A protein has these predicted regions:
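Hydrophobic, aromatic-rich transmembrane alpha-helices
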Residues: 2, 13, 93-96, 261-296, ...
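Loop-to-helix entry region of an early transmembrane alpha helix in multi-pass inner-membrane enzymes
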Residues: 62, 66, 74-90
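Transmembrane-helix signature of polytopic, membrane-embedded enzymes
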Residues: 92-118, 134, 152-156
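Membrane-interface transmembrane helices that cradle and orient dolichyl/undecaprenyl
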Residues: 103, 140-160, 192-193, 272-284, ...
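Short acidic/glycine- and proline-prone juxtamembrane loop motifs at membrane-interface regions
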Residues: 123-133, 306-307
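Specific aromatic-rich, kink-prone transmembrane helix
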Residues: 133-151, 157-160, 164-165, 183-186, ...
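Membrane-interface alpha helices of multi-pass inner-membrane proteins
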Residues: 156-173, 179-184, 212, 292-301
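Hydrophobic/aromatic-rich transmembrane helices and adjacent perimembrane loops
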Residues: 177, 296-298, 302-333
């Protein structure tokens, strides 16, 4: 077990380092028109005494202000980049364990490589807020999946899931789809089984985890005098932005999304996964599909065709990819493994070449 954890971490570190070299070298020079340049300025301004929501305006939640402030305090733009790298390493590491719920060790490393390719295809030079919260999304998805597949969950896992929920909520509220849909499923399951005491216990633990982040944050904002402005800018203004008229219609957004994921063969993998596990999981796969569609709707709600908006869906792709890979690579023969791996290189030749460039 320890050896597997060490190998998984080392491979996650390797993928993180590769991502480091594909990041824009400078937010201000490399990404002048994206939000990342604004985020870096937040870090600079706050390190020079300016206050979020009072001296600085944005419709994002306070987490992105604090992350860039912390990163800038560590080492200016390099410090921000280091925090982004750490977030990605944790994301890949947890993603490995999501894959392990559905397939073996060897296949899970293949899944991580595909996950890396998908991330590189979506991240638009990096530094965006979606990358920082990937560990929270991925960890909570892992906990929910483990609970439904193995009926196992610990107190600290629920508390950490609640904490992760609060972090994402105060980053960008339309990214909390995983908690909304899976919490509903947990509620239905426990009420149907008449496990009311366990249900109340889970609620208390989840609220405790959320409060561990929300209470100190709100106290800080209150003492700073920006609590009211935070709610106005990050909730009211963000709702106006999300519901504002994007330049694409709903059908155009769906078409755009389908084009992006079809290039990466993701829809094909979803279909293969659904067929492969129907006998094993039955209606559970339909519930998972519903959760995925709900999160997709939230990601595209602004009707703006930004690839980095799709980053929050990557953790949800991992189970599909894992099942699909397991379907085709379940032979113990090393030759079969090598042949299929070479085949994947040809399938992803375009995205791989794009990463190289």
């Amino acid at each position: 077990m320890k050896k597997e954890k060490m190998i998984a971490f080392s491979f996650s570190l390797f993928l993180g380092i590769i991502t480091w070299f594909t990041l824009a070298t400078s937010v201000r020079k490399g990404l002048p028109l994206l939000d990342a340049s604004i985020f870096e300025y937040f870090g600079y301004a706050m390190s020079h005494g300016q206050r979020m929501y009072l001296d600085l305006f944005d419709h994002k939640g306070p987490v992105i202000f604090l992350i860039n402030y912390l990163g800038y305090s560590i080492g200016a733009s390099l410090g921000i980049k280091i925090l982004y790298l750490v977030s990605l390493i944790v994301f890949f590491y947890i993603g490995y364990y999501i894959s392990r719920l559905f397939t073996g060790i060897r296949n899970s490393f293949v899944v991580l490589v595909i996950t890396f390719i998908i991330f590189e295809s979506f991240f638009e030079g990096g530094w965006g807020l979606e990358g920082y919260i990937l560990p929270c999304l991925t960890y909570s998805l892992y906990i929910f999946l483990k609970y439904f597949l193995e009926d196992k969950i610990n107190k600290y896992e629920i508390i950490l899931s609640g904490f992760s929920f609060a972090v994402v909520l105060f980053t960008k509220a339309n990214m909390i789809g995983i908690w909304l849909i899976f919490s509903l499923l947990v509620t239905i399951k426990l009420i149907y089984q008449k496990q009311f005491s366990i249900f109340l216990k889970y609620i208390a633990l989840f609220i405790t985890g959320s409060a561990l982040f929300i209470v100190p944050l709100c106290c800080f904002l209150w003492f700073q005098g920006s609590l009211k402005e935070m709610f106005y800018q990050s909730v009211v203004m963000n709702f106006i932005y999300s519901k504002g008229s994007g330049y694409l219609t709903v059908m155009e957004m769906i078409k755009w999304y389908m084009n992006q994921v079809n290039v990466l063969q993701l829809n094909l993998m979803i279909v293969i996964a659904m067929i492969a596990v129907w006998k094993q999981y039955g209606i559970k796969i339909l519930f998972y599909n519903g959760a995925f569609i709900f999160c997709l709707m939230l990601a595209l709600i602004s009707k703006r065709a930004y690839l980095h908006y799709l980053i929050v869906l990557i953790p949800l792709f991992i189970p599909y990819i894992s099942v699909a890979i397991n379907k085709f690579m379940n032979k113990s023969s090393l030759l079969c493994f090598l042949i299929f791996t070479i085949g994947l290189v040809f399938i992803y030749w375009g995205p791989i070449h794009g990463i190289k460039d």
